[in-house]
């Protein structure tokens, strides 16, 4: 049974999800998702949003349940902090400063930059280093620059299995790269957005902080539910677990597999000992 986070039409309204852009700024491709116009502002049909949001969350749940990685993308000012906070909360990855061309399609080069970032971190953290204060300041400057660009993906370990995007117009390069690599894209689409290339569209306000916060939180909650379900299915008690990062999840699953293997080996040894004792007892009875 899939336990997706619950939400109501009231939640959408209170978050301002239904407010689009000025009617003059619309993208005609969004017509199927628009309810009408009020005070020259397009109003999004929330009945469509409810259905499509549930579809998107279910798809996301299934991807994460299979231990897929999700990349949150939102580099506009009002989305940046929320994107980072919610991605970290559910143990996933994010880009919230600037999308560098080739982040997906040229992953090998990005991996080298990630390696360089980790090297700078080790140099700075090493208390026994022999570098001068000036050299350390230079390292920190380079580290900070890399961290702003790729800090949110430095532990991703490979291409993501899905993208969650706020503002498809601003993040169109990321979407094109994902499309090229057949990585599914889940995105909030405002009335000025182009739905082309979006596998799971969610019609909604992608500008207001409350709306962005609502979408990011419910996506994060869905990912957490999928992770908990996966761990519970493997017999792991999820009560008290606060770190749901992919690394921690893999550690828990490996430890659980070792425990099962040890228990199985111990059970086999016990059975062998019991059989040995039975044979000895049986043999002594036959002799008498």
Curated annotation (Swiss-Prot):
Pfam families: Ribosomal_S2
Region (Disordered): 255-288
InterPro entries the record matches: Ribosomal_uS2 (IPR001865), Ribosomal_uS2_bac/mit/plastid (IPR005706), Ribosomal_uS2_CS (IPR018130), Ribosomal_uS2_flav_dom_sf (IPR023591)
Gene3D superfamilies tied to this protein: Glucose-6-phosphate isomerase like protein, domain 1, Helix hairpin bin
A biological-process GO annotation: translation
The organism's place on the tree of life at top rank: Bacteria
GO cellular component term, pick one: cytosolic small ribosomal subunit
Keyword line: Ribonucleoprotein, Ribosomal protein
A Gene Ontology molecular function term of the record: structural constituent of ribosome
Similarity-based family: Belongs to the universal ribosomal protein uS2 family.
Name of the protein in question: Small ribosomal subunit protein uS2
